[in-house]
Amino acid sequence: MDKNDLVQKAKLAEQAERYDDMAGAMKSVTEQGGELSNEERNLLSVAYKNVVGARRSSWRVISSIEQKTEGNEKKQAMAKEYREKIETELQDICNDVLGLLDKYLIANATAAESKVFYLKMKGDYYRYLSEVAAGDAKKTTVDNSQQAYQDAFDISKKEMQPTHPIRLGLALNFSVFFYEILNNPEKACTLAKTAFDEAIAELDTLNEDSYKDSTLIMQLLKGHLTLWTSENQGDEGETGEGEN
């Protein structure tokens, strides 16, 4: 199918909230090679974020049920089997995205903004893998996630304004990684606070087009800081809702 037709198909699928179809169309666009436009890049990101998000949410629900059914072997075995099925789906989706990133997207990215966007995405999808991994696999996915986030972070600090929504979104997700995956609230808070303060100091550089995106992410950073620094930290799972 022609690239423009695939993009149109992805937009239709998004309107219909059929995100698996949307992801399939954007995967085909990516596999045609060449650099994606901003619009195409965002369509790809939205599609897979919804596809993987549904599985992450399901996995958390079933994991919780599995823990609550201790003492009832049959129920627990059924929950475990179902969790593993969801886990496999989640891993396949993440590996799909990581394959596209390594084979096409990161390699073809020329602008700093694109490189940061894709490296952040790489960090995100290794983070999602690490949430369901154990043992050596967990260590590998955590290390890969941190490396991708760090690479993106270094480029963003050099090449992008502190108010840029992609730089802010990266800081948000990297701080969530430190809090939830590395259990390092101190580092998470420092990173989020620095990103927020640097953006506040340069509010006059806010781009009119991205004003809404930037201020929304700044609010999320502030919300996380409040949650993480309060004595009653609540349920850590709540943090994930404020990802970019």
UniProtKB/Swiss-Prot annotation:
Keyword Cytoplasm among UniProt keywords: yes
Keyword Acetylation: yes
Gene3D superfamilies: 14-3-3 domain (1.20.190.20)
Gene Ontology CC: one annotated term: cytoplasm
Site (described: Interaction with phosphoserine on interacting protein): 56, 127
Induction: Repressed under stress conditions such as netting.
Keywords tagged on the record: Acetylation, Cytoplasm
Sites of N-acetylmethionine modification: 1
Cellular compartments annotated: Cytoplasm
Tissue expr: Expressed in brain, gill, heart, intestine, kidney, liver, ovary, skeletal muscle, spleen and testis.
Family: Belongs to the 14-3-3 family.
PANTHER family reported in the protein's UniProt record: 14-3-3 PROTEIN
Subunit relationships: Homodimer, and heterodimer with other family members.
Function: Adapter protein implicated in the regulation of a large spectrum of both general and specialized signaling pathways. Binds to a large number of partners, usually by recognition of a phosphoserine or phosphothreonine motif. Binding generally results in the modulation of the activity of the binding partner.
Descriptive protein name: 14-3-3 protein beta/alpha-2
